[in-house]
Amino acid sequence: MGQAGAGASLPGGGPWDVAVIGGGNAGLVAALAARRQAGRVLIVERAQAPMRGGNTRHIRNIRCVHRQADEFTTGSYPFAELWRDLCGVGTGPGNERLAELTVRESETVPGWMSAHGVKWQPPLAGTLHLGRTNRFFLGGGKALVNTYHRTAERMGIAVCHGITVEDLAMAGDRCTGLLTADGVIRARAVVAASGGFEANIAWLRRYWGDAADNYLIRGPRDNDGRVLAALYAHGAARAGEERGFHAVAVDARSPRFDGGIATRLDSIPFGIVVNSAGRRFYDEGEEIWPKRYAIWGRNIAEQPGQIAYSIWDAKVARLFLPPMYAPAQAGSISGLAASLGIDERAVAATVTGFNAAISPGGTFDPGRLDDCATAGISPPKSHWAQPIDTPPYYGIAMRPGITFTYLGVAVTPQARVMRTDGTALRNVFAAGEIMSGNILSTGYLAGFGLTIGTVWGRIAGAEAARGARDG
């Protein structure tokens, strides 16, 4: 189906068996799963075709259970370990039953993705050390979106681009259609896979106040939560923390919206981070980077002005992926602080105190939790602590970069949207970021958002098709 937009004709031909709101990973997976059982499946994508896919455009890997190494992973990653990792980030799973289901079902995800056209690549090197736990798909997120679209076209799934769903037409506990500026799309079952509300700064401001004005949004500005708001207006129950989000440290010079993965900074474990007062505020070497990189967005969000500065020296400059924009550089710490616009004396004192606190005798190893640590300072640096003493010195200003919000709709194990009265909507299902708060609370694991979207996209699509067929 060709692109649609304001004033364009909507697809006709009577009600669709399943209409999916959103054309990112969760929506595409839901449509593919639904088409196995349903005759007429439609994806309604808000973006035009060149920008379709939402946050999925910016991803590159997925975290799944696997029992042994293969050509795309470097070792086994059993259920118990992934479950332990999930429970160890933030405050643990939102709903243990649904989180356990997600982890268990993840084992079959790579095979399902391969069967629908996805190609894989050998593990990538770099700071995140993900070769054992995560699989990387060839070409990144944009390639994943395009691959699923090609598969959808072969399967006879219709797609309309440039259509914004403003509301759902409801009759009691049933949805009868999707309301758009161009008319009503009738459907027997609906899957909401339209993402969170991270691009809605006014909504973020409800929970974070004026600090939200300093957040950068890693994905598209379309993710404004209007479908989520519509579901709430129709009595959907909430799941997830109001202030919960997946956010990372990004270059403060990044665009306000849609900077994607390229704006993330991976220098943090190899140096120190200071706030606008020139003081350290968190352990930069607390854990391996895949388990801790996602806390740094929140860490920075809680600092004055929502800004912090990553500082490192020449001897570690090649140990992580280079930043998208060139860092500040100077021959002295004071000169670097001046370039960054922070107090020279404070930063120099922080670096001097940090260097003096490093325990002697450690063996630096960026590939594991080494024994290079500080002693007698707060906060400590638990691993990878080396003196910052080799010019030139480098630094970058950082801000919180929000990927997606966790507050969403509560769902059943069949992905049906729950209502505040404890019942479920009969034919409305949810998948992906819009229901991620059932699984995630405050922390995040690299690649697990795609896992949630794929597992719950399959469930939602299959259940929606079954509901449409059985009435």
Language-model features and meaning:
Residues 139-182, 188:
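Helical element adjacent to the flavin cofactor pocket in flavoenzyme catalytic cores
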Residues 5-7, 40, 46-158, 271-280, ...:
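Conserved N-terminal/central alpha/beta ligand/cofactor-binding core
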Residues 299-392, 463, 467:
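Helix-rich C-terminal "cap"/substrate-channel and partner-interaction subdomain
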Residues 348-438, 442:
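A glycine-rich dinucleotide-binding beta-alpha-beta segment and adjacent secondary-structure elements
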Residues 14-16, 181-189, 424:
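Core beta-strand elements of the Rossmann-like FAD/NAD(P) dinucleotide-binding domain
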Residues 224, 228-346:
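An anion/pyrophosphate-binding glycine-rich loop and adjacent beta-alpha core
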Residues 184-251, 459:
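Glycine-rich loop(s) and the adjacent beta-strand/alpha-helix scaffold that form part
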Residues 10-26:
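Beta1/beta-strand and adjacent pyrophosphate-binding region of the FAD-binding site
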